[in-house]
Each structure stands twice: as structure tokens, then as C-alpha cells.
């Protein structure tokens, strides 16, 4: 899934289905395995929110504990710093998207042991930012960041700071923007996780493009070949946005 190996993924999914249906499992084992399979399908339904919610509801009827498919520490967005970039697909559907995120969050947190807690604040904050409600967006960025810090979710911390960076830029405070760059970089470096370093590189490159500072963008982004960096599939759309901005600025 993360590396877009679709044929191999289909094969594995069919093998799991066959095992569940044909193995001599107890009722409890069958329910638990089927519930975990629903959480796997939740991941595979990315980024169709309606299907994801349905798989969560199916899993909740079968599992009496948090899922083992999605652990507390795994990043829900797999490196993407924006909930909105990943889930907004239908024109005029933003308010409905925010509503569904808030309505489904308790079920998701229960099934995943509070994985990526605060993503609903992040989405709402992005919506408010694009509607030029910058003060409200900034408040929501702080809410998302504080929740992420509480639950030790590095990816969400970076995402919340990225939202705040954009809001601060729109407010016309470049000194604060570059201060937030340093904070994003420090969090990513301290994590020791290559995924978060890639996320930080892209967030900072996105902002540098606004300031025409392409010389400060990491070379792997400028080269335009994300395959060499083994970027997860959910992060590629954001990479494309950043690379597109760089290409425009080169003209």
C-alpha cells in the first residue's frame, strides 16, 4: 500500500480473505481476525473517507480492544503534513468533510489507541486558513499541536506547525516563519525517522517557494525524482504540489 505495489497488495488481500473463510477458527478468533481485516481495509480505502468510516464501524462491532493494524505511534497521514490536501476531493464539500471528521474521531481513536490525535483540529484549521479566518486558524493550529505533544505524535506536531507557519506568513511575519522552520526541522531531526525528515524538507520547501528562496530547498526535491527517496504513496501528492511550485518559480 505505502509503496503502491498494487498487484502484490491485491494478492495479499485475497490470501487473507481465503484464510479467514477457510481456517478452523473459533468464533472469537474469527471476529478478531475479521475486525483486524476491516482495519486493514480502512487503510486501503485511503482517502475515501466514507469507506474508511464504514470499515471503522465494521471493525468496532467485532473488536473488543484497539486494533493491532494501526498502532498508536504510526502516523495516520504517512508523512503528508495536510489533512485537507489528502481528503478534500469534492468542490463545495469542505464543511461536510470537517463534520464527518469530528463525528468519526471518537470511533477512530478508540480503535487505534488515540493514533494521530488532533487531526480534526488540523483539518478545521486549514479550512479556516483558506477562508482567510487566520486568527481562528492559528488557534486551531495550537490546539492540534498541544494535543500532538500530549500524545507524542511527531507527524501531527510537524503538521500543526506547518499550518501555523502558513498562517503567520499570510499575516506578514517572515521572522516568525523562519523561527517555525527551525522548530519543524528540530522536531524532525530529533525523531530519527526518515519519513518525518522528508515531511520537514517538503514543508520548508513549500514555504521557501513563496519567498523565492529556491537555493535553500533540499536538492532531492529540486531533482524531481521522488522514487529515489522511497517516498510513501500518500506523501506523493504533496511532493507534486511542492515540485510544481518550484518549477513555476524557475520560469
What positions do the PLM features span?
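Helix-coil-helix junctions within alpha-helical repeat/solenoid scaffolds
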Residues: 7-17, 31, 125, 133-137, ...
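Internal alpha-solenoid helical repeat scaffolds
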Residues: 1-160
